Protein backbone atom coordinates (compact mmCIF):
# COMPACT_ATOMS: atom_id res chain seq x y z
CA UNK A 1 0.00 0.00 0.00
CA UNK A 2 2.82 2.39 0.78
CA UNK A 3 4.44 1.91 -2.62
CA UNK A 4 1.18 2.93 -4.30
CA UNK A 5 1.30 6.33 -2.60
CA UNK A 6 5.02 6.67 -3.35
CA UNK A 7 4.15 6.24 -7.03
CA UNK A 8 1.17 8.61 -6.82
CA UNK A 9 3.38 11.40 -5.44
CA UNK A 10 5.76 10.97 -8.39
CA UNK A 11 2.90 10.77 -10.91
CA UNK A 12 1.39 13.98 -9.48
CA UNK A 13 4.70 15.81 -9.88
CA UNK A 14 5.18 14.47 -13.42
CA UNK A 15 1.67 15.56 -14.35
CA UNK A 16 2.33 19.07 -12.97
CA UNK A 17 5.62 19.31 -14.87
CA UNK A 18 7.69 19.47 -11.68
CA UNK A 19 9.36 16.11 -12.37
CA UNK A 20 10.14 14.13 -15.52
CA UNK A 21 10.70 10.47 -16.30
CA UNK A 22 14.16 11.37 -17.62
CA UNK A 23 15.32 13.19 -14.49
CA UNK A 24 18.03 11.24 -12.69
CA UNK A 25 18.73 10.94 -8.99
CA UNK A 26 22.02 9.92 -7.43
CA UNK A 27 21.68 6.88 -5.20
CA UNK A 28 22.58 7.46 -1.56
CA UNK A 29 24.12 4.99 0.84
CA UNK A 30 20.80 5.03 2.71
CA UNK A 31 18.90 3.80 -0.37
CA UNK A 32 21.64 1.31 -1.28
CA UNK A 33 21.58 -0.20 2.21
CA UNK A 34 18.05 -1.48 1.57
CA UNK A 35 19.28 -3.36 -1.50
CA UNK A 36 21.59 -5.31 0.81
CA UNK A 37 19.03 -5.99 3.52
CA UNK A 38 17.13 -8.98 2.16
CA UNK A 39 14.05 -6.90 1.35
CA UNK A 40 12.67 -6.65 -2.21
CA UNK A 41 15.19 -4.65 -4.18
CA UNK A 42 16.13 -3.11 -7.50
CA UNK A 43 19.82 -3.60 -6.50
CA UNK A 44 20.90 -0.02 -7.07
CA UNK A 45 24.42 0.97 -6.06
CA UNK A 46 25.75 4.02 -4.21
CA UNK A 47 26.52 6.74 -6.75
CA UNK A 48 24.36 5.26 -9.53
CA UNK A 49 22.41 7.89 -11.45
CA UNK A 50 18.97 6.34 -11.99
CA UNK A 51 16.08 7.89 -13.90
CA UNK A 52 12.72 8.54 -12.31
CA UNK A 53 11.19 6.16 -14.86
CA UNK A 54 13.54 3.34 -13.87
CA UNK A 55 12.97 3.98 -10.17
CA UNK A 56 9.20 3.88 -10.70
CA UNK A 57 9.51 0.61 -12.60
CA UNK A 58 11.76 -0.70 -9.83
CA UNK A 59 9.00 0.12 -7.36
CA UNK A 60 6.08 -1.10 -9.44
CA UNK A 61 7.51 -4.19 -11.13
CA UNK A 62 9.91 -5.59 -8.51
CA UNK A 63 8.65 -3.83 -5.37
CA UNK A 64 12.10 -2.33 -4.78
CA UNK A 65 12.40 -0.77 -1.36
CA UNK A 66 15.72 0.78 -2.37
CA UNK A 67 14.01 2.46 -5.34
CA UNK A 68 11.37 3.91 -2.99
CA UNK A 69 13.99 5.51 -0.79
CA UNK A 70 15.97 6.83 -3.77
CA UNK A 71 12.84 8.38 -5.29
CA UNK A 72 11.78 9.87 -1.94
CA UNK A 73 15.20 11.39 -1.32
CA UNK A 74 15.38 12.73 -4.87
CA UNK A 75 11.97 14.38 -4.67
CA UNK A 76 11.85 15.63 -1.08
CA UNK A 77 15.45 15.59 0.13
CA UNK A 78 14.75 12.97 2.79
CA UNK A 79 12.48 10.01 3.30
CA UNK A 80 10.97 11.72 6.34
CA UNK A 81 9.92 14.79 4.32
CA UNK A 82 8.55 12.53 1.61
CA UNK A 83 6.43 10.67 4.18
CA UNK A 84 4.92 14.03 5.19
CA UNK A 85 4.02 14.62 1.52
CA UNK A 86 2.47 11.14 1.34
CA UNK A 87 0.32 11.63 4.44
CA UNK A 88 -0.79 15.05 3.20
CA UNK A 89 -1.81 13.57 -0.16
CA UNK A 90 -3.68 10.78 1.64
CA UNK A 91 -5.74 13.33 3.56
CA UNK A 92 -6.32 15.37 0.37
CA UNK A 93 -7.91 12.40 -1.43
CA UNK A 94 -10.06 11.35 1.54
CA UNK A 95 -7.91 8.74 3.28
CA UNK A 96 -8.88 9.61 6.85
CA UNK A 97 -7.31 6.65 8.66
CA UNK A 98 -3.87 6.49 7.07
CA UNK A 99 -0.41 7.66 8.07
CA UNK A 100 2.87 7.17 6.26
CA UNK A 101 6.21 7.07 8.06
CA UNK A 102 8.39 5.90 5.17
CA UNK A 103 8.28 5.50 1.40
CA UNK A 104 8.63 1.72 1.18
CA UNK A 105 6.25 0.26 3.73
CA UNK A 106 9.00 -1.50 5.63
CA UNK A 107 7.78 -2.32 9.13
CA UNK A 108 6.94 0.72 11.21
CA UNK A 109 3.96 0.99 13.57
CA UNK A 110 3.44 4.59 12.45
CA UNK A 111 2.80 3.38 8.89
CA UNK A 112 -0.86 2.30 8.84
CA UNK A 113 -4.08 2.37 6.84
CA UNK A 114 -7.49 0.74 6.45
CA UNK A 115 -8.97 -1.36 3.67
CA UNK A 116 -11.32 1.53 2.86
CA UNK A 117 -8.44 3.99 2.54
CA UNK A 118 -6.40 1.59 0.39
CA UNK A 119 -9.42 1.29 -1.92
CA UNK A 120 -9.68 5.09 -2.13
CA UNK A 121 -5.98 5.32 -3.00
CA UNK A 122 -6.13 2.53 -5.59
CA UNK A 123 -9.16 4.09 -7.26
CA UNK A 124 -7.40 7.46 -7.29
CA UNK A 125 -4.42 5.93 -9.10
CA UNK A 126 -6.53 4.12 -11.71
CA UNK A 127 -8.84 7.09 -12.34
CA UNK A 128 -6.22 9.84 -12.42
CA UNK A 129 -3.27 8.07 -14.02
CA UNK A 130 -4.50 5.46 -16.51
CA UNK A 131 -1.40 6.06 -18.66
CA UNK A 132 0.87 5.21 -15.72
CA UNK A 133 -1.36 2.39 -14.49
CA UNK A 134 -0.14 0.40 -17.50
CA UNK A 135 3.21 0.03 -15.70
CA UNK A 136 1.48 -2.21 -13.17
CA UNK A 137 0.90 -4.79 -15.90
CA UNK A 138 4.58 -5.11 -16.82
CA UNK A 139 6.26 -8.41 -16.04
CA UNK A 140 9.84 -7.16 -16.35
CA UNK A 141 11.96 -4.18 -17.26
CA UNK A 142 15.58 -3.46 -18.15
CA UNK A 143 17.55 -0.52 -16.82
CA UNK A 144 21.10 0.66 -17.41
CA UNK A 145 23.24 0.62 -14.31
CA UNK A 146 25.78 3.44 -14.17
CA UNK A 147 29.07 1.98 -15.40
CA UNK A 148 27.70 -1.55 -15.61
CA UNK A 149 25.77 -3.92 -17.82
CA UNK A 150 22.02 -3.42 -18.25
CA UNK A 151 19.96 -5.29 -15.67
CA UNK A 152 16.67 -7.03 -16.44
CA UNK A 153 14.40 -7.64 -13.49
CA UNK A 154 11.00 -9.21 -13.30
CA UNK A 155 8.01 -9.92 -11.16
CA UNK A 156 7.35 -13.59 -10.56
CA UNK A 157 4.10 -13.24 -8.62
CA UNK A 158 0.96 -15.24 -9.32
CA UNK A 159 -0.59 -12.20 -10.97
CA UNK A 160 0.23 -13.56 -14.40
CA UNK A 161 -1.69 -16.81 -13.91
CA UNK A 162 -4.96 -14.88 -14.24
CA UNK A 163 -6.35 -14.16 -17.73
CA UNK A 164 -7.17 -10.56 -16.72
CA UNK A 165 -4.56 -9.44 -14.22
CA UNK A 166 -5.19 -6.44 -11.99
CA UNK A 167 -2.42 -5.69 -9.55
CA UNK A 168 -1.52 -2.60 -7.61
CA UNK A 169 1.03 -2.62 -4.81
Give the label of every model feature segment:
Residues 1-119, 126-127:
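Active-site-adjacent loops and short helices of periplasmic peptidoglycan-processing enzymes
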Residues 13, 144-147, 164:
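Residue-level detector of alpha-helical segments with a strong bias toward transmembrane helices
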Residues 70, 135, 168:
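Residues that scaffold the ATP/ADP-binding catalytic core of kinase and kinase-like folds
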Residues 128-159:
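Conserved active-site loop region of the serine DD-peptidase/beta-lactamase
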Residues 160-169:
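Single conserved hydrophobic/aromatic residue that forms the stacking wall/gate
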Amino acid sequence: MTKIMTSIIAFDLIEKGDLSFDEKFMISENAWRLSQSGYSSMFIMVGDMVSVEDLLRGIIVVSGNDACVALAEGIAGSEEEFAVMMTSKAKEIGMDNTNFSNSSGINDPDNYSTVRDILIMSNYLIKNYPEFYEMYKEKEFTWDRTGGDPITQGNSCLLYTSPSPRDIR
